[in-house]
């Protein structure tokens, strides 16, 4: 019954920020917005690819910097949702779902 479900279902694992590459004074890690990771699959995403990289110490993006808007635009493309789709905020203001992002080419073959 579930065979082929990933053809039309996108699976996304991510957080809203990364974590510092070093341990802080309390033995933990702090928020780190300069670099973060996401894992995507299904719905037309290419399998087994890595897009972009950080510096050796994990502090900065070393290649292929993308934004959260780019990731959202790529998810919308994978699900065949128009980038012109709008929704209404609580105050009634129309908002574009893609918000100006670009498709990340390395995620699709």
Feature-to-residue mapping (PLM):
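Ligand-binding pockets and gating/stacking loops
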Residues: 1-109
């Amino acid at each position: 019954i579930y065979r082929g479900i990933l053809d039309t279902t996108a699976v996304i694992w991510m957080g809203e920020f990364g974590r510092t590459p070093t341990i802080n004074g309390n033995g933990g890690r702090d928020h780190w917005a300069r670099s973060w990771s996401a894992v995507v699959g299904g719905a037309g995403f290419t399998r087994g690819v890595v897009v972009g990289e950080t510096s050796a110490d994990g502090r900065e993006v070393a290649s292929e910097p993308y934004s959260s808007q780019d990731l959202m635009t790529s998810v919308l493309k994978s699900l065949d949702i128009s980038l012109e789709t709008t929704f209404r905020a609580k105050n009634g203001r129309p908002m574009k779902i893609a918000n100006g992002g670009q498709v990340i080419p390395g995620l699709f073959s």
